[in-house]
Amino acid sequence: MNPIIAAASVIAAGLSVGLAAIGPGMGQGTAAGYAVEGIARQPEAEGKIRGALLLSFAFMESLTIYGLVVALALLFANPFAGS
């Protein structure tokens, strides 16, 4: 494998995981903050708020997992490496 392609693949894999984690990380922090605020304001709605929060966390975390899949594809099944 060409060393330039190998180096670019490693850099791209690191960037894909890092950048894919920034957005969901900030979103989860914001959502958790608003959930705590909502529960503090209306404690009887805790169950509904928690359910919606966990579902939204799952959707946000799926974006990070997609970034991890792209990174693993670049590292172990690199389509740019050729034969």
UniProtKB/Swiss-Prot annotation:
CDD domains: ATP-synt_Fo_c_ATPH (cd18183). Its main location: plastid. The record marks 61 as: Reversibly protonated during proton transport. The lineage of its organism: Eukaryota, Viridiplantae, Chlorophyta, core chlorophytes, Chlorophyceae. The chain crosses the membrane at residues 3-23, 57-77. F(1)F(0) ATP synthase produces ATP from ADP in the presence of a proton or sodium gradient. F-type ATPases consist of two structural domains, F(1) containing the extramembraneous catalytic core and F(0) containing the membrane proton channel, linked together by a central stalk and a peripheral stalk. During catalysis, ATP synthesis in the catalytic domain of F(1) is coupled via a rotary mechanism of the central stalk subunits to proton translocation. Key component of the F(0) channel; it plays a direct role in translocation across the membrane. A homomeric c-ring of between 10-14 subunits forms the central stalk rotor element with the F(1) delta and epsilon subunits. GO terms for cellular component: chloroplast thylakoid membrane; proton-transporting ATP synthase complex; proton-transporting two-sector ATPase complex, proton-transporting domain. This is ATP synthase subunit c, chloroplastic. SUPFAM superfamilies: F1F0 ATP synthase subunit C. It comes from the Eukaryota.
